[in-house]
Amino acid sequence: MANPILEQAKENMEKAEASLRRTLGQIRAGRANASLVNRVNVEYYGAMTPLNQIAAITIPEARVLLITPYDKGALEDIEKALYTADIGISPANDGSVIRLVIPQLTGERRKEIAKEVGKEAELAKVVVRNARRDAMDNLKKAEKASEISEDEMHDLEEQVQNLTNEATKKIDAISKDKEKEITEG
């Protein structure tokens, strides 16, 4: 796959998949997951610092996230950052660590989250389809400019379609896995 148009399409499709994984990782599914606090930044000595750089994040139980700061003086700053991050979970500070207890999800909330997962997956598919469309347009332009032959264009179009199908299958699998995680709780 030496064609730059194919490379660009593949890269864009992989970015859509990676973005979906990141987004779904931040959706609370009734289980403790360190990615819930990935986007939390703590004001630490005057600078905004990612939480995972100033504290160890562990999962001692299925529904408990344990945050142990490397510097005990940062405990209150971390707690404040968790409150302001609006992750939907109240931190419990016991003086040396912070516990985030993930509440059990109700059936109704599970359905809402599953719908949200579906919407995010559909957005990722739109990005994939846009990458496909852009690649097809670029192939047609290249053919009109006599940079590639008609046969090459058809072969490349087929490869772009295969990339699209592959990316869509991956997105569906990621989405199904997350929905399964949510419904099983």
Curated annotation (Swiss-Prot):
Residues 167-185 have a biased composition (Basic and acidic residues). GO terms for cellular component: cytoplasm. InterPro entries: Ribosome_recyc_fac, Ribosome_recyc_fac_dom, RRF_sf. GO terms for biological process: translational termination. GO terms for molecular function: ribosomal large subunit binding. Pfam families: RRF. Residues 163-185 are annotated as: Disordered. Keywords: Cytoplasm, Protein biosynthesis. It is found in: Cytoplasm. Responsible for the release of ribosomes from messenger RNA at the termination of protein biosynthesis. May increase the efficiency of translation by recycling ribosomes from one round of translation to another. Belongs to the RRF family. PANTHER family: MITOCHONDRIAL RIBOSOME RECYCLING FACTOR PSEUDO 1, RIBOSOME RECYCLING FACTOR. This is Ribosome-recycling factor. The lineage of its organism: Bacteria, Bacillati, Bacillota, Bacilli, Lactobacillales.
